[in-house]
Amino acid sequence: MGMLDGRVAVCTGSGRGVGAEVAKLMAANGAKVVVNDPGVGGGGEGSGDQTPAQQIVDEIKQAGGQAVANYGSVTKFDDCLAMVQQARDTFGGLHIVFNPAGILRDKMFHNMFPEDWQAVIDVHLNGHFNVNRAAINLFREQGYGRIIMVSSTSGLLGNLGQCNYGAAKLGIVALARIVALENASKGITCNVICPSADTRMTRSVPTPKDPTAAALREERLRRSRADAIAPLCVYLASEQAKDVNGQVFHQRAGELSVYGHMRPLRMVHRNGGWTPETIAEVGMPSLSIAFTALDGGRSVHPGLPME
């Protein structure tokens, strides 16, 4: 008996990387899987390469599982409706949506072109809306659904050159929280994973010029296997995770952590209110001891060891 016996999953962008590993492990645990991948490049360029999705489908079938390929784009709502319908027509229903589809177009903010901003927002944030909006009413009607959204520490903590990606990924956290709140009474859970893994996307990020930093990055990537992320996703997609809802998880190799939601770290009060001068003299010095370091998350995720 697998944890997902009798369940049907749609996995977007799953011809490569984390998505491919999750699709395969879901199938190994009994799920029937719609493997979606439009076959575009790492920046969203091109289209129509059916090889990535079909290859994962073939691997699943060779291992004794059930899967079908889908080549639609998460940027198009009609394509997402078609994914849901394909799951129902082929396998008789839908219970799980996993959302790793993504691209990168990294540039510093002052060099970011509007089209690069919009392309990344469309795939990540709008893509999450499209595929989950296409599935949510079915989930509500049947009183069961598992949604696993994909964010990133670039959104939670910030990262140089990724203002478009980070903005989309933090937006996904807010979207997931609201979807979880609105649908908890309907037997639906919605959680977020922030995976750190060696994939085509992470390899496209420029290597640091400093040799020490470059070597550390390479070692982190070497240890961050994409298949290490899959067990968490299978668990979150299962009935055993029915009481896990609205949470944000980070996983990297053997490390598994949960993030807290935004809340005040420190508060100061002044009778009669504040003036710019009293904020400068009293308010800000008192609050500053709780400031978050502007270090791209290094103080939160210091690095090795990870195993």
Predicted feature locations:
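Canonical Rossmann dinucleotide-binding motif of NAD(H)/NADP(H)-dependent dehydrogenases/reductases
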Residues: 2-35, 40
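Residue(s) in the substrate-gating loop at a strand-loop-helix junction
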Residues: 152
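A glycine-rich helix->loop->beta "capping" turn
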Residues: 5, 63-68, 86-99, 105-108, ...
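The beta1-alpha1 cofactor-binding region of Rossmann-like NAD(H)/NADP(H)-dependent oxidoreductases
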Residues: 50, 54, 71-85, 114
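Active-site helix of classical SDR
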Residues: 132, 168, 176
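Substrate-binding pocket helix/loop in short-chain dehydrogenase/reductase
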Residues: 60, 108-109, 116-121
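C-terminal helical subdomain
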Residues: 213-307
